[in-house]
């Protein structure tokens, strides 16, 4: 009953619904792609699952029409990252926020062109939005790698003379942060693989993924994202008096 209540509570929020729609969409694409490619007798079921996946993706695209303001507020609050101690983290975070901020209007124009609201070439705008998404993911990968390197160095650095070792609580916090960064790294890499696939042919492995592989990468990323969100929520509850 507690887990059911937790799920219902998560679905009351926009982010909770978006995560569920995302994981369901990619799971449908994964299973549908496998059935179409490997099980001819079940190809009709696979095709239907791929249609469901497409519709769920379209649903998320429409819901993102309202994300610009939230992203702008976050970008404005972060600013130039004055609260960050590390200059590299500050730089990649600011660039990532800029890429994310530009991504949304580009996707909106592409969607409006497909819906024939605007008379422009949608393919160019889809390519631009996907490129911005890939850039944001690449910056996220660079940030996570840098953070993992720095945290590992701090944990393994020998204790200087006349200084006390790291307190157990701080060490555990750093280890938890390393785990979080590792999960973010894996999630971003999985999404980056799909982002490159959706770029125009001729760019690395663009257009070469079968539907099931796109579904697999997206499912991995979605599950990791949901796990991180649940973990963060649990930690927040644990620290609440």
Swiss-Prot record:
Q: Topological domains (Cytoplasmic): residue ranges?
A: 1-124, 228-241
Domain of life, per UniProt, equals: Eukaryota
The way it spans or sits in the membrane comes to: Multi-pass membrane protein
Which compartment or compartments is the protein found in?
Peroxisome membrane
**Which residues does UniProt call coiled coil?**
none
The chain's Lumenal topological domains, given as residue ranges, are 150-211
- Give the matching InterPro entries: PEX11, PEX11C_met
Would you name any one GO CC term?
A: protein-containing complex
Assigned keywords, A-Z: Membrane, Peroxisome, Transmembrane, Transmembrane helix
PANTHER family, per the entry: PEROXISOMAL BIOGENESIS FACTOR 11, PEROXISOMAL MEMBRANE PROTEIN 11C
What is known about its subunit structure? Homodimer. Heterodimer with either PEX11A or PEX11B. Interacts with FIS1.
Provide the function of this protein: Promotes membrane protrusion and elongation on the peroxisomal surface.
Give the protein name, as stated in the record: Peroxisomal membrane protein 11C
* Lineage summary: Eukaryota, Metazoa, Chordata, Craniata, Vertebrata
């Amino acid at each position: 009953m507690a887990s059911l209540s937790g799920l219902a509570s998560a679905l009351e929020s926009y982010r909770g619904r978006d995560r569920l729609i995302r994981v369901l969409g990619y799971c449908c694409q994964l299973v549908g792609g496998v059935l179409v490619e490997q099980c001819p007798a079940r190809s009709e079921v696979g095709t239907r699952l791929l249609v469901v996946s497409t519709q769920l993706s379209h649903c998320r695209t429409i819901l993102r029409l309202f994300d610009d303001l939230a992203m702008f507020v976050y970008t404005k609050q972060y600013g130039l990252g004055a609260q960050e101690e590390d200059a590299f983290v500050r730089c990649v975070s600011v660039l990532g926020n800029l890429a994310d901020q530009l991504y949304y209007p580009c996707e909106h124009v592409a969607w409006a062109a497909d819906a024939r609201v605007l008379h422009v070439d949608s393919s160019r705008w889809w390519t631009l939005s996907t490129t911005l998404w890939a850039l944001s993911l690449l910056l996220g990968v660079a940030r996570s790698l840098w953070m993992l390197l720095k945290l590992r160095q701090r944990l393994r650095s020998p204790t200087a003379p006349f200084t006390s070792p790291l307190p157990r609580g701080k060490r555990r916090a750093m280890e938890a942060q390393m785990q979080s960064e590792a999960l973010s790294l894996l999630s971003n890499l999985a999404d980056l693989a799909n982002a490159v696939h959706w770029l125009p042919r001729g760019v690395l492995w663009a257009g070469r993924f079968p539907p099931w592989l796109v579904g697999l990468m997206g499912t991995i990323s979605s599950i990791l994202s949901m796990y991180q969100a649940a973990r963060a929520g649990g930690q927040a509850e644990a620290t609440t008096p």
